[in-house]
Curated annotation (Swiss-Prot):
This is Chaperonin GroEL. Its main location: cytoplasm. It is an enzyme of class 5 (isomerase). It catalyses: ATP + H2O + a folded polypeptide = ADP + phosphate + an unfolded polypeptide. Gene3D superfamilies: GroEL, GroEL-like equatorial domain, TCP-1-like chaperonin intermediate domain.
């Protein structure tokens, strides 16, 4: 076991804060409509230009172990916010940096870090409640487009195309983002469905950048039991291999020898296959397998109806134009199923919704209708160069996540205004403990930081703008894009309430952990001895 470097107290906390500041300062320049670009060097290919906070954060590793720990903890803030809300990563990073900076002053002055953290937690809980109260539902296409535009760095075209996609496939429908072939963004709606099961082994991945397994023109084998013996599968695998097409296997589970053989065949390029577990449980699993069968024009191979895996033929398999399998989701695009059968299946499920008694059953049945009838909307991002394409795709994906979050929990005034207005909930919050009250004050000041950073990136004077916004009420704020003051929602500057809430909660959570840290342990790298020089080669012995 390698030796460890163990450090305590203010000195190591300061190193951790240095790491926080290095990462946060790189991320914060991207915030707001006039946020700047960050250029990231890549080992292969051209540099990556981005305005996406989490992309910048993921690229940062620091040489000093203790500084790096601080940076990695803030990276977790951005990453968690991105996972939950899909956007707000830069706001979360700016909030975390502010809470840590303010909190460290109090810790250094001798206040109890645990009480400070309790005060921060109480303040955040009050702010979250207030954000819920001031959030407005986001229902119309216009509001959805506005949210999308803001998240895509004020690109109105992106907002409009996302609103159109949601209109076509419904708010529950599946929307994916792909590279386009032209200079313009395009929207393509294809019949398809998505379910929440991913590949059973990462060795099935064939697109390392997206971390997915993509199958073009595949067969689909649907089986309602476990597959562990490869001999059961061999007859159908041989038929698929002769057809020179990939295969997706959807079964209760694929394990042991069967999974190992599929992985080896895939790696060697003998037969491109991917195995996923069937979605749902019990009777719902059977129903969803049947949905996929109807969509792809195949049948569910089940002993209950007298079909066995060994006797399966290509006629029993479903087919699709393309299937994408990620870590957690599988998307079937353009199944070869009969349109009349799909419509009949949807009508049948809708009848079940009418007779269902529990809300849970109704919700699950509605999900199935959305998957069968809604289809998949594909946004094809257009750009002149590959570097621009990557940057635009980052923004479109951010905007898509933001609009979903807005539909879920409603919208609040954007541009950092909602957090300032939610401060009202803290003004009368007294904990009865001086150190906890100091924790509340830390959050009270930190909620100004996103607006301050937006103004700074736009070349304005943060203190002047914050004071003027605080003089106003409701949605009154500063639109950094146009340089005007006014009703933020009226000007179309909106943020999803879920994004603002997640950013605040995750920032406070990690910052609180940092403030209560008193010891850090890092591995001491072993010094490797220098390789000795090679001795000189002997002479050739006077050979002629």
């Amino acid at each position: 076991m390698a030796a460890k470097d163990v450090q305590f107290g203010n000195e190591v906390r300061q190193k951790m804060v240095n790491g926080v500041n290095i990462l946060a300062n790189a991320v914060r320049v991207t915030l707001g409509p006039k946020g700047r670009n960050v250029v990231v060097d890549r080992a292969f290919g051209g540099p990556h230009i981005t305005k996406d906070g989490v992309t910048v954060a993921k690229e940062i590793e620091l040489k000093d172990k203790f500084e790096n720990m601080g940076a990695q903890m803030v990276k977790e803030v951005a990453s968690k916010t991105n996972d939950v809300a899909g956007d707000g990563t830069t706001t979360a990073t700016v909030l975390a940096q502010s809470i840590v900076a303010e909190g460290m002053k109090y810790v250094t002055a001798g206040m109890n870090p645990t009480d400070l953290k309790r005060g921060i937690d109480k303040a955040v809980a009050a702010l979250v409640e207030e954000l819920k109260n001031i959030a407005k539902p986001c229902d119309t296409s216009k509001e959805i487009a506005q949210v999308g535009s803001i998240s895509a760095n004020s690109d109105e075209q992106v907002g409009a195309i996302i609103a159109e996609a949601m209109e076509k496939v419904g708010k529950e429908g599946v929307i994916t983002v792909e590279d386009g072939k032209s200079l313009e963004n395009e929207l393509d709606v294809v019949e398809g469905m998505q379910f929440d099961r991913g590949y059973l082994s990462p060795y099935f991945i064939n697109d390392a950048e997206k971390q997915i397994a993509g199958l073009d023109n595949p067969f689909v084998l649907l089986f309602d039991k476990k597959i562990s013996n490869i001999r059961d599968l061999l007859p159908v695998l041989e038929q698929v291999a002769k057809a020179s097409r990939p295969l997706l296997i959807i079964a209760e589970d694929v394990e042991g020898e069967a999974l190992a053989t599929l992985v080896v065949n895939n790696i060697r390029g003998i037969l491109k296959t991917v195995a996923v577990k069937a979605p749902g449980f019990g009777d719902r699993r059977k129903a969803m397998l049947q949905d996929i069968a109807i969509l792809t024009g195949g049948v569910v191979i089940s002993e209950e109806v007298g079909l066995s895996l060994e006797k399966a033929t290509l006629d029993d398999l479903g087919q699709a134009k393309r299937i994408e399998i990620g870590k957690e989701n599988t998307t079937v695009i353009d199944g070869f199923g009969d349109a009349a059968q799909i419509e009949a299946r949807v009508a049948e499920i809708r009848q079940q919704i009418e007779t269902a008694t529990s809300d849970y059953d109704k919700e699950k049945l509605q999900e199935r209708v959305a998957k069968l009838a809604g289809g998949v909307a594909v946004i094809k991002v257009g750009a002149a160069t590959e570097v621009e394409m990557k940057e635009k795709k980052d923004r479109v994906e951010d905007a898509l996540h933001a609009t979903r979050a807005a539909v879920e929990e409603g919208v609040v005034a954007g541009g950092g205004v909602a957090l300032l207005r939610a401060r009202a909930a803290l003004e009368n919050l007294h904990t009865g403990n001086a150190d906890q009250d100091a924790g509340v004050q830390i959050v009270l000041r930190a909620v100004e930081s996103p607006l301050r950073q937006i103004v700074a990136n736009a070349g304005g004077e943060p203190s002047v703008v914050v004071n003027k916004v605080l003089e106003g009420k409701g949605n009154y704020g500063y639109n950094a894009g146009s340089g005007e003051y006014g009703d933020m929602i009226g000007m179309g500057v909106l943020d999803p309430a879920k994004v603002t809430r997640s950013a605040l909660q995750h920032a406070a959570s990690i910052a609180g952990l940092m403030l209560t840290t008193d010891c850090m342990i890092a591995e001491i790298p072993e010094e490797k001895p220098a390789v000795p020089d090679m001795g000189g080669m002997g002479g050739m012995g006077g050979m002629m």
